[in-house]
């Protein structure tokens, strides 16, 4: 319903892969994609715990990775407004069979690709950046020209400001940014044009899209 971006990564050498943020309706498409490529899905990786990013995580039947501060949301969309839970039919959600917590500062491998985990709260308590050599999965921390909302339950505008001042600001300009919604961008472009990032050293940060 919210046009969430779901990313699938398949290692062509090992035919193993993972998906990032499988929202509502993603599971059948993910299964079809992996079948077409004769690949094995080994992990679901979540940038945060909002329903539009996690709805089909358990349906894929593999290990689910999420920051511990958002793990409670895997329980039928815990912590979100009732209208969101109804929109995503949260009452019918199954909890994942196996959950691994993403820890700030750790390096973790998915399907042969290394990612650094950077905690970047604000949009949600457990939002993370997943940083590789050439790209970052930014979830709803930063989008092209905007940032994640901070008017939701468990959002925190002050924490978002600090994330923009620290973890986001520190990302290398060369990185491609693969956000949770909207088109891809680069850190170089966002540093030059994103008004929320540019104002991150002031107190005038407001939630964007």
Regions found by a protein language model. Give the residues of each.
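Residue-level marker for buried hydrophobic side chains located in beta-strands
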Residues: 18, 45, 64, 137, ...
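Residue-level detector of beta-strand structural context in well-folded domains
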Residues: 7, 100, 105-106, 128, ...
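Conserved beta-strand hairpin/beta-sheet module of binuclear metal-dependent hydrolase folds
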Residues: 1-37, 129-139
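Metallo-beta-lactamase
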Residues: 25, 39, 79-84, 113-209
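Residue in the alpha/beta-hydrolase core beta-strand immediately N-terminal to the catalytic nucleophile
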Residues: 18, 45, 109, 118-119
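Residue-level detector of conserved, well-ordered beta-strand and adjacent loop positions
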Residues: 10, 103, 109, 121, ...
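Active-site HxH/HxHxD metal-binding segment of metal-dependent hydrolases
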Residues: 24-109, 192-200
């Amino acid at each position: 319903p919210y046009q969430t971006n779901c990313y699938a990564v398949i290692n062509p050498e090992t035919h193993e892969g993972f998906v990032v943020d499988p929202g509502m309706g993603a599971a059948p498409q993910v299964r079809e994609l992996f079948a077409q490529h004769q690949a094995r899905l080994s992990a679901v990786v979540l940038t945060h715990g909002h329903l539009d990013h996690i709805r089909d995580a358990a349906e894929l039947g593999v290990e689910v990775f999420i920051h511990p501060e958002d793990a409670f949301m895997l329980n039928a969309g815990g912590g979100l407004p009732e209208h969101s839970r109804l929109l995503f039919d949260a009452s019918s959600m199954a909890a994942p069979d196996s959950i691994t917590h993403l820890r700030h500062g750790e390096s973790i491998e998915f399907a042969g690709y290394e990612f650094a985990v950077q905690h970047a709260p604000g949009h949600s308590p457990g939002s993370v950046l997943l940083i590789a050599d050439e790209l970052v999965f930014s979830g709803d921390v930063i989008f092209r020209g905007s940032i994640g909302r901070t008017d939701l339950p468990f959002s925190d505008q002050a924490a978002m400001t600090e994330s923009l001042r620290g973890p986001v600001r520190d990302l290398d300009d060369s990185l491609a940014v693969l956000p949770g919604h909207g088109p891809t961008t680069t850190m170089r472009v966002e540093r030059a044009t994103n008004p929320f990032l540019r104002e991150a050293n002031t107190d005038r940060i407001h939630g964007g899209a």
